[in-house]
């Protein structure tokens, strides 16, 4: 009744969904680190610590990366709901 006719996922399916989500988050983090490092940190590594400019650049880059990711996720969710789908293959 409350599941809207869909069977409840099994424990194995729940674990697989969490593992998949973790994989997606890890891949997103890797992409963000790679992109922001290439953009913000000089290849010559003059100092052991980040300069103020590098630190600010990395902070802004990461914020923009996550903001863009959120906007894309929201748009995909709206499009999926508009088509009447319940989710990404689930």
Curated annotation (Swiss-Prot):
Cell location: Mitochondrion inner membrane
UniProt entry tagged with the keyword Cytoplasm: no
Topology versus the membrane: Peripheral membrane protein
Gene3D superfamilies noted in UniProt: Mitochondrial import inner membrane translocase subunit tim13 like domains
Keywords, sorted A to Z: Chaperone, Disulfide bond, Membrane, Metal-binding, Mitochondrion, Mitochondrion inner membrane, Protein transport, Translocation, Transport, Zinc
Pfam family, one: zf-Tim10_DDP
SUPFAM superfamilies, per the entry: Tim10-like
One example of a Gene Ontology biological process annotation: protein insertion into mitochondrial inner membrane
Superkingdom: Eukaryota
One example GO MF annotation: unfolded protein binding
Entry GO CC: mitochondrial inner membrane; mitochondrial intermembrane space protein transporter complex; TIM22 mitochondrial import inner membrane insertion complex
Cysteine disulfide partners in this protein: 36-61, 40-57
Motif, Twin CX3C motif: chain positions: 36-61
Main localisation: mitochondrion
Biological role stated in the UniProt entry: Mitochondrial intermembrane chaperone that participates in the import and insertion of multi-pass transmembrane proteins into the mitochondrial inner membrane. Also required for the transfer of beta-barrel precursors from the TOM complex to the sorting and assembly machinery (SAM complex) of the outer membrane. Acts as a chaperone-like protein that protects the hydrophobic precursors from aggregation and guide them through the mitochondrial intermembrane space.
Family note: Belongs to the small Tim family.
Subunit structure, interactors included: Heterohexamer; composed of 3 copies of tim9 and 3 copies of tim10, named soluble 70 kDa complex. Associates directly with the TIM22 complex, whose core is composed of tim22 and tim54. Interacts with the transmembrane regions of multi-pass transmembrane proteins in transit.
Comment, domains: The twin CX3C motif contains 4 conserved Cys residues that form 2 disulfide bonds in the mitochondrial intermembrane space. However, during the transit of tim10 from cytoplasm into mitochondrion, the Cys residues probably coordinate zinc, thereby preventing folding and allowing its transfer across mitochondrial outer membrane.
Entries under PANTHER family matching the protein: MITOCHONDRIAL IMPORT INNER MEMBRANE TRANSLOCASE SUBUNIT TIM10 (PTHR11038:SF16)
Protein name, UniProt field: Mitochondrial import inner membrane translocase subunit tim10
Taxonomic placement: Eukaryota, Fungi, Dikarya, Ascomycota, Pezizomycotina
Gene, per the UniProt record: tim10
